[in-house]
Amino acid sequence: MTEKVTKLALASRLIVLLVQLVANGALPEHKPDVFRMPVSSDQNASWIDKVIKRCLGGLRHWDGEYFLHIAENLYSYENTLAFYPLYPVVVRHVGQAVEAIGISLSQESILLVVAVALNFWLFCESANLLFQLTQVLFNDLNKSWNAALIYCFNPATIFFTAAYSETFFAYSSLHLMLECSKPTGSFRYLRLGTALAACLLCRSNGLITLGYPLYFFGRQLLLKNKEPNTCMQLTQMTLTILGAIGILHTYYFYIYRLYCLPNTRPNHPQHIVDYAVERKYLLSGQGSEGSPWCQYTLPFPYTYVQSHYWDVGFLRYYKWKQLPNFLLALPMLSFMHWHCYDYMQHLAKAVWAKLTPSGFKELIRDHTTFPFVLHAAILTLVCTVYVHIQVSTRLLASATPVFYWFAADHMPKTLAQLKLRSKAGALFVWCTTYSLVGTVLFSNNYPWT
């Protein structure tokens, strides 16, 4: 089954790549006034560079420009601090390894190829992780396959191929969830800690994934009788979590040193400086006078940067001019709100029926999906009231497997049994329409969810 899932995932990525290639060549590219990675005039484009730009150029738009800029120049502009480092830094180091081989490509082309190739590989791996996680929790091959199928053609599928961190985060979070959900009851702390650190370094919402090791470790202590090695396990789990948080704070310290300490003066290339002047961006190395967040008691830049540069905040996006973006996000948000509410309603009835210590343990043992649905419900609520509403589809599609489990419940055993005038049919139309339209629009630099 692993081979079958891998073939499905790879085929879906090749379809997206083909649609992007055709759309990028057939339609005129939109040129919005947004961030574009500044490129040195010293880079001479060879014919291979032009072929790569022609074939993959549609996969670098919007946030992809930021990730590729960080991969090449690190955090030279303050607005790039909205993007966490794991994905672009991995792309950077793999790109440097490829460049060391002596391939005659520009750095811009190498980074784009590496970014897309990395997402291809991680997508196939994450599809298999989703299949395995679903099988561990539900022991249902049909549901596991349908979940993987929907994942491969999810409504935000273009963002899992483009130079975005969605695929890396999906891979990291699914790996963490699978490690926490292992039925053996013994945690592999090194793997768990690595996956947790990857989640924290990949996306800001990775912080919520801390709840998984905490919940499943507490669940194990509750359901099992006290064992002689409980203290050792508690120590190991504590060190694992603190280690992952410590790695995240190493990144925070690096950013603080880069932007707030007066003795840090990066030697920026001239084209980076020129673009900063043109766009009125704050360059790193300005010292504590450069930005207000340097004076905060806890000088974490993320919230400030999101608020200052993107106007992200509680209900700030609720404006009439954003109605099209609300409509784009409506299918995902309404789907998730309803199914999470329905799950919690049934859970509340089960809790009410078993208000005893033994009944509580039974609930914890039987409702293994509770932390996943709670996580999904929190993310859905945050998307609804806080973030730019149009990112809800890709955020939820990459951050939680719950969407795929709920969707898989509506799917028939085979696609031959699929009827368009049914819930499964509506789901099929939604996923295929968003996949196709999203790929066409995104690859030509038009706004998309």
UniProtKB/Swiss-Prot annotation:
<feature type="topological domain" description="Cytoplasmic">
    <location>
        <begin position="257"/>
        <end position="368"/>
    </location>
</feature>
<dbReference type="InterPro" id="IPR007315">
    <property type="entry name" value="PIG-V/Gpi18"/>
</dbReference>
<feature type="topological domain" description="Lumenal">
    <location>
        <begin position="131"/>
        <end position="148"/>
    </location>
</feature>
<keyword id="KW-0472">Membrane</keyword>
<keyword id="KW-0256">Endoplasmic reticulum</keyword>
<dbReference type="Pfam" id="PF04188">
    <property type="entry name" value="Mannosyl_trans2"/>
</dbReference>
<feature type="topological domain" description="Cytoplasmic">
    <location>
        <begin position="170"/>
        <end position="196"/>
    </location>
</feature>
<dbReference type="GO" id="GO:0045313">
    <property type="term" value="P:rhabdomere membrane biogenesis"/>
</dbReference>
<feature type="transmembrane region" description="Helical">
    <location>
        <begin position="110"/>
        <end position="130"/>
    </location>
</feature>
<feature type="glycosylation site" description="N-linked (GlcNAc...) asparagine">
    <location>
        <position position="142"/>
    </location>
</feature>
<dbReference type="GO" id="GO:0000009">
    <property type="term" value="F:alpha-1,6-mannosyltransferase activity"/>
</dbReference>
<keyword id="KW-0808">Transferase</keyword>
<feature type="topological domain" description="Cytoplasmic">
    <location>
        <begin position="1"/>
        <end position="7"/>
    </location>
</feature>
<keyword id="KW-0337">GPI-anchor biosynthesis</keyword>
<feature type="transmembrane region" description="Helical">
    <location>
        <begin position="197"/>
        <end position="217"/>
    </location>
</feature>
<dbReference type="GO" id="GO:0004376">
    <property type="term" value="F:glycolipid mannosyltransferase activity"/>
</dbReference>
<feature type="topological domain" description="Lumenal">
    <location>
        <begin position="29"/>
        <end position="82"/>
    </location>
</feature>
<comment type="pathway">
    <text>Glycolipid biosynthesis; glycosylphosphatidylinositol-anchor biosynthesis.</text>
</comment>
<feature type="transmembrane region" description="Helical">
    <location>
        <begin position="369"/>
        <end position="389"/>
    </location>
</feature>
<dbReference type="GO" id="GO:0031501">
    <property type="term" value="C:mannosyltransferase complex"/>
</dbReference>
<feature type="transmembrane region" description="Helical">
    <location>
        <begin position="149"/>
        <end position="169"/>
    </location>
</feature>
<comment type="similarity">
    <text>Belongs to the PIGV family.</text>
</comment>
<dbReference type="GO" id="GO:0005789">
    <property type="term" value="C:endoplasmic reticulum membrane"/>
</dbReference>
<feature type="topological domain" description="Lumenal">
    <location>
        <begin position="390"/>
        <end position="423"/>
    </location>
</feature>
<keyword id="KW-0812">Transmembrane</keyword>
<feature type="topological domain" description="Cytoplasmic">
    <location>
        <begin position="104"/>
        <end position="109"/>
    </location>
</feature>
<feature type="transmembrane region" description="Helical">
    <location>
        <begin position="83"/>
        <end position="103"/>
    </location>
</feature>
<keyword id="KW-0328">Glycosyltransferase</keyword>
<feature type="transmembrane region" description="Helical">
    <location>
        <begin position="8"/>
        <end position="28"/>
    </location>
</feature>
<keyword id="KW-1133">Transmembrane helix</keyword>
<feature type="transmembrane region" description="Helical">
    <location>
        <begin position="236"/>
        <end position="256"/>
    </location>
</feature>
<feature type="topological domain" description="Lumenal">
    <location>
        <begin position="218"/>
        <end position="235"/>
    </location>
</feature>
<feature type="glycosylation site" description="N-linked (GlcNAc...) asparagine">
    <location>
        <position position="44"/>
    </location>
</feature>
<keyword id="KW-0325">Glycoprotein</keyword>
<feature type="topological domain" description="Cytoplasmic">
    <location>
        <begin position="445"/>
        <end position="449"/>
    </location>
</feature>
<dbReference type="GO" id="GO:0000030">
    <property type="term" value="F:mannosyltransferase activity"/>
</dbReference>
<feature type="transmembrane region" description="Helical">
    <location>
        <begin position="424"/>
        <end position="444"/>
    </location>
</feature>
<dbReference type="GO" id="GO:0006506">
    <property type="term" value="P:GPI anchor biosynthetic process"/>
</dbReference>
<protein>
    <recommendedName>
        <fullName>GPI mannosyltransferase 2</fullName>
        <ecNumber>2.4.1.-</ecNumber>
    </recommendedName>
</protein>
<comment type="function">
    <text>Mannosyltransferase involved in glycosylphosphatidylinositol-anchor biosynthesis. Transfers the second mannose to the glycosylphosphatidylinositol during GPI precursor assembly. Required for the GPI-mediated endoplasmic reticulum exit and proper targeting to the cell surface of chp. Required for GPI-mediated membrane attachment of chp, qsm and Cont. Essential for microvillar stability in the rhabdomere.</text>
</comment>
